[in-house]
């Protein structure tokens, strides 16, 4: 039985399903095996780890309450011994329907000390955003550029509260002086695509709605400069950034920063040619996230495939594409940039490549020379410099 047919045979919200709130980055092997979490910076601190069935998840203490681990279904059953799909180090799916996530399940609570908070934007789906507001005490009326951010994780892991994302975006907000809205979208396989895309589009539209009409969120209403809306995301979030920018209304988005984008294709290119195991892994991962997909040349995962919508339709004035030389996906990012430039798109585009580093390296090493250079470049882009 295929993975898609297995899930379609289960009843709605089967025993053991979660709400899709655990995740992490992208490619599973070698340089994209995924980062170890460094001690949180400007964030709540981890106090212990719990190990269960080989899955290690950190538990955080906020005042006197503990944040539950989202990595495992509530109670294992006898059927948990039978594995339907093994996608370690990301996740394992058991015949019972239980999903065990190994990465990206830790959640750091929003911390008032650094002006962050979580807001549910759709009670029906549970989709929320985490906002990051830089210090505006001295300039309470100052308007800030608004950065809408989409996290990575192959559409199956990670969340806005993960230490890597929380710490990185806290640092970026402080250094760049931007108001960041990070979208906590639903995950596959519990919520197959296009759920993630729909949630991110809804989050983007929620932000834009503050430019006119009743104020929904005071931080955005008081401090957001809606003439300076920017999008960014890494890995799967880079994929989503492209998706949203292709579907937004013209004139709304100032610029997009696409970081180490999760794009694939049926024909191996670059680093992929000598790594068939990674290709096989990502083919399985993509089909898990998008069971109705056309395959690796689906325009959702391969925006430069024959028949894909022209990149001339990207709805922004400026774009920067970041790639990493040791990234399995590096050639896909280059191909996207080249296709954008040749498409007839009328904006300004730039490709930034960092050698000797792998997929989303900047999320686990904030102080390294290359990470600092990358953030400096990103900040300059956000400021229009």
From Swiss-Prot:
Free-text tissue specificity from the UniProt record: Expressed in roots, stems, leaves, petals, stamens and pistils, but not in bulb scales.
Enzyme class: lyase
Temperature-dependence annotation: Optimum temperature is 35-45 degrees Celsius.
Active site: 235, 327, 359
Activity modulation: Inhibited by NaF, AgNO(3), HgCl(2), CuSO(4) and phenylmethylsulfonyl fluoride (PMSF).
Outcome reported for the amino acid change (mutating residue 327 to N): Loss of activity
pH dependence of activity: Optimum pH is 6.5-7.5.
Family in the record: Belongs to the AB hydrolase superfamily.
Name the record gives this protein: Tuliposide A-converting enzyme 1, chloroplastic
Origin species: Tulipa gesneriana (Garden tulip)
Gene giving rise to this polypeptide: TCEA1
């Amino acid at each position: 039985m295929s993975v898609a047919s297995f899930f379609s045979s289960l009843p709605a919200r089967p025993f053991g399903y979660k709400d899709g709130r655990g995740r992490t980055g992208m490619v599973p092997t070698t340089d994209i095996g995924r980062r170890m979490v460094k001690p949180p910076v400007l964030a709540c601190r981890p106090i212990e780890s719990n190990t269960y069935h080989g899955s290690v998840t950190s538990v955080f203490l906020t005042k006197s309450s503990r944040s539950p681990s989202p990595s495992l279904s509530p109670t294992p059953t006898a059927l948990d011994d039978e594995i339907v799909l093994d996608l370690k180090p990301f996740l394992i799916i058991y015949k019972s329907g239980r999903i065990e996530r190994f990465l990206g399940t830790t959640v750091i609570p929003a911390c008032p000390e650094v002006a962050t908070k979580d807001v549910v934007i759709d009670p029906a789906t549970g989709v929320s955003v985490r906002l990051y507001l830089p210090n505006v005490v001295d300039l309470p009326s100052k308007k800030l550029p608004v950065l809408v951010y989409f996290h990575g994780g192959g559409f199956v892991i990670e969340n806005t509260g993960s230490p890597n994302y929380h710490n990185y975006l806290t640092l970026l907000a402080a250094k760049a002086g931007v108001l960041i809205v990070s979208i906590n979208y639903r995950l596959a396989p519990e919520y197959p695509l296009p759920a993630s895309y729909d949630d991110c589009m809804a989050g983007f539209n929620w932000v834009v709605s503050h430019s006119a009409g009743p104020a929904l969120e005071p931080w955005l209403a008081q401090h957001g400069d809606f003439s300076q809306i920017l999008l960014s995301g890494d890995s799967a979030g880079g994929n989503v950034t492209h998706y949203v920018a292709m579907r937004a209304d013209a004139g709304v988005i100032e610029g997009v920063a696409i970081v180490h984008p999760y794009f694939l294709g049926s024909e191996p290119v670059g680093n992929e040619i000598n790594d068939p195991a990674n290709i096989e892994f990502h083919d399985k991962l993509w089909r898990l996230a998008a069971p109705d997909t056309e395959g690796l040349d689906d325009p959702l995962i391969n925006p430069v495939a024959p028949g894909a919508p022209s990149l001339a339709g990207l709805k922004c004035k400026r774009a920067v594409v970041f790639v990493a030389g040791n990234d399995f996906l590096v050639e896909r990012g280059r191909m996207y940039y080249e296709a954008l430039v040749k498409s007839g798109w009328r904006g300004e585009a730039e490709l930034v490549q960092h050698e000797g580093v792998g997929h989303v390296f900047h999320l686990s090493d904030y102080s390294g020379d290359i990470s600092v250079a990358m953030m400096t470049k990103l900040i300059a882009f956000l400021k229009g410099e």
